């Protein structure tokens, strides 16, 4: 069964909705963006998340010190890194790691030390999907997430195309820039039940 990550959550209600609907991963954005939360805010929201739902911190070009501080303060289960990744960034971290890769048409997949890869659109959080035909996941060493412009209407097709470990959504479950609780529920339901329903 494909796992689901709901990213960019910043309110108690959105976290509770995602958890009750069956999300496997909850993402907190620490990089500057309209979805950014502080470590203190994330730590409070993390108290609402049961142990079987994994907490992910999202960073852009962080230092190792930044990662370790967030892991400690929030109790993160994974760190997701966009942008520049130092060679030793993921070494001996006390949690798992995800390296984000922007699919920009050159088909290049980096040789990464991360535990997972996440394939995203050239502009993360834009709501625009990348050209799925530009990405060949054959022979990848790591399990991978598919992100970038996913929503309840295209996520089943994405799963059928890539057979990913997980799918990741943020703007695809928003209305007017805010997390939409019904869209969160429908997205997760589509992932968990949608494959059989479309065949």
Swiss-Prot record:
It catalyses: N-(5-phospho-beta-D-ribosyl)anthranilate = 1-(2-carboxyphenylamino)-1-deoxy-D-ribulose 5-phosphate. Keywords: Amino-acid biosynthesis, Aromatic amino acid biosynthesis, Isomerase, Tryptophan biosynthesis. InterPro entries: Aldolase_TIM (IPR013785), PRAI_dom (IPR001240), RibuloseP-bd_barrel (IPR011060), TrpF_fam (IPR044643). Belongs to the TrpF family. GO terms for biological process: L-tryptophan biosynthetic process. It is an enzyme of class 5 (isomerase). This is N-(5'-phosphoribosyl)anthranilate isomerase.
């Amino acid at each position: 069964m494909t796992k689901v990550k709901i990213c960019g959550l910043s309110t108690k209600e959105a976290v509770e909705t995602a958890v009750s609907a069956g999300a496997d991963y909850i993402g907190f954005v620490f990089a500057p963006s309209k979805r950014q939360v502080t470590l203190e805010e994330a730590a409070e929201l993390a108290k609402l998340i049961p142990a079987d739902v994994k907490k992910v911190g999202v960073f852009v070009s962080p230092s190792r010190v930044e990662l370790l501080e967030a892991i400690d303060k929030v109790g993160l289960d994974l760190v997701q890194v966009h942008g520049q990744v130092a060679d030793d960034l993921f070494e001996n971290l006390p949690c798992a790691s995800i390296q984000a890769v922007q699919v920009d048409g050159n088909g290049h997949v980096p040789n990464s030390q991360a535990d997972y890869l996440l394939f995203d659109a050239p502009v993360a959080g834009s709501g625009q999907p990348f050209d799925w035909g530009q990405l060949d996941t054959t022979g990848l060493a790591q399990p991978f997430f598919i992100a970038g412009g996913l929503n309840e209407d295209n996520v089943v097709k994405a799963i059928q195309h890539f057979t990913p470990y997980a799918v990741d959504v943020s703007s695809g479950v928003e209305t007017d820039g805010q997390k939409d609780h019904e869209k969160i529920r429908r997205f997760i339901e589509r992932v968990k039940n949608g494959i059989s329903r479309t065949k």
